[in-house]
C-alpha cells in the first residue's frame, strides 16, 4: 500500500530537517473526528522500523490559537539548547509562537518549550518560512499584507528587521504564501490572493520584480526551483482556472510552462528537494499529484480519500517519502513509489512517462576491479548558471596487504639477477630473520644449494654435523674405522687387473710376483734350499740366509695348531685355495681367509668377502658392506631413522648421479612414515622433489596461524618454493602446486602486482595448465598495462665491428641461466648461407634470469651449419663425485661415470622481438620453420661440478651476417645478394598444404582481402598500408608453417574450427577459439595470432 504510516489529526504539518520527527498543529477551519475546538502542537516520531502503522506521540503542548501555517527550521543560534532547531507557528490571531522541539520531546516540563512570541501582524499568518541558507532568519506574511523578517539568533529575544518598502500597501493584498530562494539568501518571494507575485531583495529593502497573469487569478502558493535560481512556480486556487505556472525572472512577460491536470483550485504545493524535476501538489478536486516539471506530465498520484488534502510535504531525510494532511482528519505518510499506479487511466497506463527519480542515482559509488583497482564516482557540483550535475570517475590502486607487497618487491629484487651470490644472501637473510628452528634448517639447506662448485658437498656434510679432513688423500674415505683403512688387498692372480708394484710389495713383502711357493717355508723334515736368490727377493735386507731359515723354522716349531697349519699348507701346495679359505673360515681366521681368497681369484675373493661381511657384527661394517656391494639403499632401510643425518651424509659421500636423487627420495619417504617431517623435508629438498616438498610445506597454510594472515603464510611458502625451483630447475609441477601458484597469483593481482603475478604464472609449463589457471593467466595478461615501445620499428639487430678471418672459437660462459624463460620463436629465416659472425642474443632481465655480460662474438664460416640447440635439462641436488675407495676396482667394477652430471649444455635461445617489431631472421627454438641450423658449438671440458643444485646451461651465440671481408678477391667483393623477402599471403607457397587444411588457406585469404578492402586497399593511407602489409606478412608466415606441416595437431585443429566459424560469420565463436589458442598454444602461435584477432574484429565491424 502507498500509505505506510499515519495518525488521526486535522493539522498542518512541518517535518524536522535533521531528525525523524513531525510537528502537527491543529488546523484552523478544520474539524477532526473528536469535534474538539482546542488547539495543540504535537510532535510525532517517524519510526519506519516499527510495524505499528500509527505514529508514536513523543511531545505535546497546548496552543492559544489554531494554526494557519507551521514551519520547522534548523538551529540558527548554534546553541545545544536548540539542537533540533525551532518550530514556528502562524496563528489565526496574527501572532507567531516559537517552540523548542527538544524541550517538547525531552525530560523538561513542556511549559518551557514556548521560547518566543512574535506579535506584529494584524491578521491570520499564512506565510511563514525559515531561510534555508541562514536558518536564523524567519519570514512571515499575513492578511494585512505586511511581510516581516525576524532574526532568531537568540530565540528568547527575537529582533525584527524594518518593514520592507511597499509591504502592507493596498496593492499587495492578503499574503497567501512566502518562500525564500534556495540559492540566494536575500531573495524572498510572496504571493497574494489578488494574483500578484512580488520578489523582494532584503539588501535593498524593497521589491525588485512583481508580476501577475493576465486575468489576475488568485494565487494560493508558490515555490522556488531548487536548482534554477530564477525560476518560480505559482499555483492558483481559482476553481475556474486551477493552473500551475512556471515563471522565469529573466522574462516575466509570459510563463515558461503551464501545468494542467487539476479540476479545481490548488491548495498546497512543494518542490522535491532531492529531485528538482518532481513537484507535489494537492487541490480541492481531491487529487494529490506528483508532476514532472521538465515535461509537465503526471508522474504519480496519491490514492484519493473521502476529502481532499490541504497540506503536503516531502520528507527531507528519506527521498520519496511524503506527508499529506486531509480534511478527513488524517495525516498520512506515503511512499511515492507505491503511488505510481494511481491516477493513470488503465488504457493509458503504458503511455505514462516512467522516469527513475534522481535519488535512485547513487551520489557516490565504488566498485572493486581486477588487479587491485577500485573505481569510484561522485557527483560534481554543476557549473555556475547550469542545473546539470556531472559525475567524476576516479581510479584508485587499492593495497590491503602492504606487508605482502613490500616482501614481494624485496624478494623479486633479490632473485631478479639470479646470480648465486644474491640467492645465497637471500637464504642467509631469511635464516637469520626467522625464529623457527625448522625454518632456519630449511633456509640453511637452501643456501647450500647455491654454493660455489666444489664446495657444496663439504658445506652439506658440515651442515649435517660432520667435518671432512683438510686434505683428502687419493679421495680415500675418511671417518671410517681404522680397520677399513688397514684392509690393503691386492690381486696378484693371473686373471686380475694390473696394479702398481708398490701396492703389490706393500701387501706381501716376501713375494716377488714370480712364484708364490718359492718363498713358502718348508716342513721341518724337508731340506731347505741354500740358494738366496731362490728364497728371497734381491732387495730383502736380511743378512744371511741361515738366520732367515732359522727364524722360519722356529716359528713353525711354535705353531699352536700344527694340524690346521698342515691342512692349509697341503691345500696351498696343490693350489686348492677354496679349501684353504674354508679351513680358515672354519677356524674363524677371517683375516687369513681374506688374504688367501684374494690370491685365489676374483670369484673366491668376492664370496669370501661376502661371508666375512655377513658374519661381522660391527655396526660400521654394515656401512662397508653397502659401499662394497654398491647397495646404499640397504643403509636407508637397515639404519634407524634417528640416525638420518649420518645416513644422508653417507649418501652425500658415496651416491652418484641419479642414484642420489632416488636414494634421498627413499630416505625422505621413510622419515615421513616415521613422523619426522622436518628431516623428510630436508631430504626431499636434497632430492630436488619440489612437488613433495611443497606439499608438506602447504600444510602450514591450514595448520599454522599464530595470528598471521593467510597471505603472509602463502608468501613464506612461495618464497621457499621459488628458491627451490630455481635451485632444481624444475618446471613440471603437479596440479596441487599449480593451484598454489594460482592462489598466489590471484593475491598478487588483487594488490595490483599484475606484472609480478604474470611472472609467477610463466614459471608453470603452459602446456598443462588447468582451464582456471589459463583464464587467470589470460586475464592478468589482458589487464596488465602494455609496455611502452621505446625502440624504432623494423627488423634490426645491433652489430659490432669484428676482425675478419678469425678462428671460429666459442667461449661458453658457465653462468646461471633462467630455466623458466619463455622461448620466443623466429618467424622466418634467410634461405641462403653466407659467412656468419656469431653474436650473443640480447638478454632481457627477468625475475628468474640474471642480466649477463655479452661474450664477444666470434666469426664462423660454415656452408651448412647444424643446430646444437638442446632442451633444458632438469637438474637435481646432486653431490659431486664421491671419493673412490683405494683400489676400488678390486671390489667391483664401476657402474657410473666419475662425473655426477654433465657440464653446461649449449642451448640456443633466440631473442624475442620487441613490441611492434618483426622477429628477426634466425633459427627457431622449437623448429616451427625449416631454418638454417646453428653452427656446432664445442664447449671446453668441464671438471667435476660438485654438490651443485642448479643447472648452468650456457647460451649459444646467435649468428648474424657481417659484411664481406675487404681482403677477398674481386668476385667476393661484389655486393651480397639482398635478403629474401618474408613470405606474404600472395607469395607464400601453399602447394604442399594437406587437403583438409586447404579450406583454412582459403578462409584466411578471404579474410585478408576483406580486411584490406575495409582499410582502403590500394587507396589506403600510409598507416593503413603498413597494417595491410603487416597482416600479409603474419598470415604468410602461418601459410609457410601449414605448407611445411610444421604446426601441432592441436593448433591446427583449433585453427580449422576457427575458420569454420568465420565461414559461418560466427565471430563470437571464432574469438572464443582465438582465446583458447592464446592460453594453450601461445608459444607456437604468438607471431600471427594477434594479427588474426585484429582482422576478425575488423571483419565483424564491417558485417555490422
Swiss-Prot record:
It holds the Pfam family TPR_Sec16. It comes from the Eukaryota. InterPro entries: Sec16_Sec23-bd, SEC31-like, WD40/YVTN_repeat-like_dom_sf, WD40_repeat_CS, WD40_repeat_dom_sf, WD40_rpt. Residues 959-977 have a biased composition (Low complexity). WD repeats lie at residues 5-45, 62-109, 120-160, 170-210, 214-257, 261-301, 304-344, 662-707. This is Protein transport protein SEC31 homolog B. GO terms for biological process: endoplasmic reticulum to Golgi vesicle-mediated transport; protein transport. It is found in: Golgi apparatus; Endoplasmic reticulum. The gene is SEC31B. The keyword Protein transport applies. Keywords: Endoplasmic reticulum, ER-Golgi transport, Golgi apparatus, Phosphoprotein, Protein transport, Repeat, Transport, WD repeat. Residues 786-811, 863-874, 892-908 have a biased composition (Polar residues). Residues 549-560 have a biased composition (Acidic residues). The modification Phosphothreonine is found at residue 526. One of its GO terms (cellular component) is Golgi apparatus. Transmembrane segments: none annotated. Residues 527-562, 782-811, 851-874, 892-931, 952-994 are annotated as: Disordered. Interacts with SEC13A and SEC13B. Required for protein transport from the endoplasmic reticulum to the Golgi apparatus. Gene3D superfamilies: 1.25.40.1030, Functional domain of the splicing factor Prp18 (1.20.940.10), YVTN repeat-like/Quinoprotein amine dehydrogenase (2.130.10.10). Belongs to the WD repeat SEC31 family.
Amino acid at each position: 500500500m502507498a500509505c505506510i504510516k499515519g495518525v488521526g489529526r486535522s493539522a498542518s504539518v512541518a517535518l524536522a530537517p535533521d531528525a525523524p520527527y513531525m510537528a502537527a498543529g491543529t488546523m484552523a477551519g478544520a474539524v477532526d473526528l473528536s469535534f474538539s475546538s482546542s488547539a495543540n502542537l504535537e510532535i510525532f516520531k517517524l519510526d519506519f522500523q516499527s510495524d505499528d502503522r500509527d505514529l508514536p506521540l513523543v511531545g505535546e503542548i497546548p496552543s492559544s490559537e489554531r494554526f494557519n501555517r507551521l514551519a520547522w527550521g534548523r538551529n540558527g543560534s548554534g546553541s545545544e539548547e536548540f539542537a533540533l532547531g525551532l518550530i514556528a507557528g502562524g496563528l489565526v490571531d496574527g501572532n507567531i509562537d516559537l517552540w523548542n522541539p527538544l524541550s517538547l520531546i525531552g525530560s523538561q516540563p513542556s511549559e518551557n518549550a514556548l521560547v518566543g512570541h512574535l506579535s506584529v501582524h494584524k491578521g491570520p499568518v499564512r506565510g511563514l518560512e525559515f531561510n534555508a541558507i541562514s536558518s536564523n532568519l524567519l519570514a512571515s506574511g499575513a492578511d494585512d499584507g505586511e511581510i516581516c523578517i525576524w532574526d532568531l539568533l537568540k530565540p528568547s529575544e527575537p529582533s525584527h528587521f524594518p518593514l520592507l518598502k511597499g509591504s502592507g500597501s493596498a496593492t499587495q493584498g492578503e499574503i497567501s504564501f512566502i518562500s525564500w530562494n534556495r540559492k540566494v539568501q536575500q531573495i524572498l518571494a510572496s504571493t497574494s490572493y489578488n494574483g500578484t507575485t512580488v520578489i523582494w531583495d532584503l539588501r535593498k529593502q524593497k521589491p525588485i520584480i512583481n508580476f501577475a497573469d493576465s486575468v489576475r487569478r488568485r494565487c494560493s502558493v508558490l515555490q522556488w526551483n531548487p536548482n534554477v535560481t530564477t525560476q518560480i512556480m505559482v499555483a492558483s486556487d481559482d476553481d475556474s482556472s486551477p493552473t500551475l505556472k512556471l515563471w522565469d525572472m529573466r522574462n516575466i512577460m509570459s510563463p515558461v510552462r503551464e501545468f494542467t491536470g487539476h479540476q479545481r483550485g490548488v491548495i498546497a504545493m512543494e518542490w522535491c528537494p532531492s529531485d528538482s524535476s518532481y513537484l507535489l501538489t494537492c487541490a480541492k478536486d481531491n487529487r494529490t499529484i506528483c508532476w514532472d516539471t521538465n515535461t509537465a506530465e503526471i508522474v504519480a498520484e496519491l490514492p484519493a480519500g473521502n476529502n481532499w488534502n490541504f497540506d503536503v510535504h516531502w520528507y527531507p531525510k528519506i527521498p520519496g517519502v511524503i506527508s499529506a494532511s486531509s480534511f478527513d482528519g488524517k495525516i498520512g505518510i506515503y511512499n511515492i513509489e507505491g503511488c505510481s499506479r494511481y491516477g493513470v487511466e488503465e488504457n493509458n497506463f503504458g503511455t505514462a512517462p516512467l522516469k527513475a527519480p534522481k535519488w535512485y542515482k547513487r551520489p557516490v559509488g565504488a566498485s572493486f576491479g581486477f588487479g587491485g583497482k577500485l573505481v569510484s564516482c561522485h557527483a560534481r557540483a554543476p557549473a555556475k548558471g547550469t542545473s546539470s550535475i556531472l559525475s567524476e570517475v576516479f581510479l584508485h590502486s587499492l593495497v590491503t596487504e602492504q606487508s605482502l607487497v613490500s616482501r614481494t618487491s624485496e624478494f623479486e629484487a633479490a632473485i631478479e639477477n639470479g646470480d648465486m651470490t644474491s640467492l645465497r644472501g637471500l637464504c642467509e637473510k631469511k635464516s637469520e630473520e626467522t625464529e623457527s628452528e625448522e625454518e632456519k634448517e630449511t633456509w640453511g639447506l637452501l643456501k647450500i644449494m647455491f654454493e660455489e662448485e666444489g664446495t657444496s658437498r663439504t658445506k652439506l656434510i658440515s651442515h649435517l654435523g660432520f667435518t671432512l679432513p683438510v686434505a683428502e688423500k687419493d679421495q680415500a674415505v675418511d671417518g671410517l674405522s681404522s680397520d677399513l683403512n688397514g684392509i690393503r688387498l691386492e690381486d696378484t692372480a693371473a686373471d686380475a687387473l694390473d696394479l702398481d708394484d708398490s701396492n703389490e710389495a706393500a701387501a706381501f713383502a716376501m713375494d716377488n710376483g714370480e712364484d708364490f711357493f718359492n718363498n713358502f717355508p718348508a716342513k721341518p723334515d724337508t731340506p731347505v734350499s741354500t740358494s738366496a736368490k731362490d728364497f728371497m727377493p734381491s732387495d730383502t735386507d736380511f743378512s744371511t740366509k741361515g738366520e732367515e731359515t732359522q727364524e722360519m723354522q722356529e716359528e713353525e716349531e711354535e705353531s699352536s695348531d700344527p694340524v690346521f697349519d698342515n691342512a692349509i699348507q697341503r691345500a696351498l701346495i696343490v693350489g686348492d685355495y677354496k679349501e684353504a679359505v674354508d679351513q680358515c673360515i672354519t677356524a674363524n681366521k677371517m683375516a687369513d681367509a681374506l688374504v688367501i681368497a684374494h690370491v685365489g681369484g676374483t670369484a673366491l675373493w668376492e664370496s669370501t668377502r661376502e661371508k666375512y661381511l655377513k658374519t661381522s657384527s660391527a655396526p660400521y661394517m654394515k656401512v662397508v658392506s653397502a659401499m662394497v656391494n654398491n647397495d646404499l639403499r640397504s643403509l636407508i632401510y637397515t639404519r634407524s631413522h634417528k640416525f638420518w643425518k649420518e645416513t644422508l651424509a653417507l649418501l652425500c659421500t658415496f651416491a652418484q648421479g641419479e642414484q642420489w636423487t632416488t636414494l634421498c627420495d627413499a630416505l625422505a619417504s621413510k622419515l615421513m612414515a616415521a613422523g619426522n617431517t622436518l628431516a623428510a623435508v630436508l631430504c626431499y629438498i636434497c632430492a630436488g622433489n619440489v612437488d613433495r616438498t611443497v606439499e608438506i610445506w602447504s600444510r602450514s597454510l591450514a595448520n599454522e596461524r599464530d595470528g598471521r594472515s593467510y597471505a603472509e603464510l602463502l608468501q613464506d611458502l612461495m618464497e621457499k618454493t621459488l628458491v627451490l625451483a630455481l635451485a632444481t630447475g624444475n618446471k613440471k609441477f603437479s596440479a596441487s602446486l599449480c593451484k598454489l601458484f594460482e592462489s598466489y597469483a590471484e593475491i598478487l593481482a588483487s594488490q595490483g602486482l599484475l606484472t609480478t603475478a604474470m611472472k609467477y604464472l610463466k614459471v608453470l609449463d603452459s602446456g598443462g595448465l588447468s582451464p582456471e589457471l589459463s583464464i587467470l593467466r589470460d586475464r592478468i595478461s589482458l589487464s596488465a598495462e602494455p609496455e611502452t615501445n621505446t625502440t624504432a620499428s623494423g627488423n634490426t639487430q645491433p652489430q659490432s665491428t669484428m676482425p675478419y678471418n678469425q678462428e671460429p672459437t666459442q667461449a661458453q660462459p658457465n653462468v646461471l641461466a633462467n630455466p623458466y624463460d619463455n622461448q620466443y620463436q623466429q618467424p622466418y629465416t634467410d634461405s641462403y648461407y653466407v659467412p656468419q659472425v656469431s653474436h650473443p642474443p640480447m638478454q632481457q632481465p627477468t625475475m628468474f634470469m640474471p642480466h649477463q655480460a655479452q661474450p664477444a662474438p666470434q666469426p664462423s664460416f660454415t656452408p651448412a651449419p647444424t643446430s646444437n640447440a638442446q632442451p633444458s635439462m632438469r637438474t637435481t641436488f646432486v653431490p659431486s663425485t664421491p671419493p673412490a675407495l683405494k683400489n676400488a676396482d678390486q671390489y667391483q667394477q664401476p657402474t657410473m661415470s666419475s662425473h655426477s652430471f654433465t657440464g653446461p649444455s649449449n642451448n640456443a635461445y633466440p631473442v624475442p622481438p620487441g613490441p611492434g617489431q618483426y622477429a628477426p631472421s634466425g633459427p627457431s627454438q622449437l623448429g616451427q620453420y625449416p631454418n638454417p641450423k646453428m653452427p656446432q658449438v664445442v664447449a671446453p671440458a668441464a671438471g667435476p661440478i660438485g654438490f651443485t643444485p642448479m643447472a648452468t646451461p650456457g647460451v649459444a651465440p646467435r649468428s648474424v651476417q657481417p659484411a664481406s671481408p675487404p681482403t677477398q678477391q674481386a668476385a667476393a667483393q661484389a655486393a651480397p645478394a639482398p635478403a629474401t623477402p618474408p613470405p606474404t599471403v600472395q607469395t607464400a607457397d601453399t602447394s604442399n598444404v594437406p587437403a583438409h587444411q586447404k579450406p583454412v588457406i582459403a578462409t584466411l585469404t578471404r579474410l585478408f582481402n576483406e580486411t584490406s578492402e575495409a582499410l582502403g586497399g590500394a587507396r589506403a593511407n600510409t598507416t593503413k598500408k603498413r597494417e595491410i602489409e603487416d597482416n600479409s606478412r603474419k598470415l604468410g608466415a602461418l601459410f609457410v608453417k601449414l605448407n611445411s606441416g610444421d604446426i601441432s595437431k592441436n593448433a591446427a585443429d583449433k585453427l580449422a574450427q576457427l575458420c569454420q566459424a568465420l565461414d559461418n560469420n560466427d565471430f563470437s565463436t571464432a574469438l572464443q577459439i582465438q582465446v583458447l589458442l592464446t592460453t594453450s598454444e601461445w608459444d607456437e602461435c604468438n607471431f600471427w595470432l594477434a594479427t588474426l584477432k585484429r582482422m576478425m574484429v575488423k571483419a565483424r565491424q564491417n558485417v555490422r
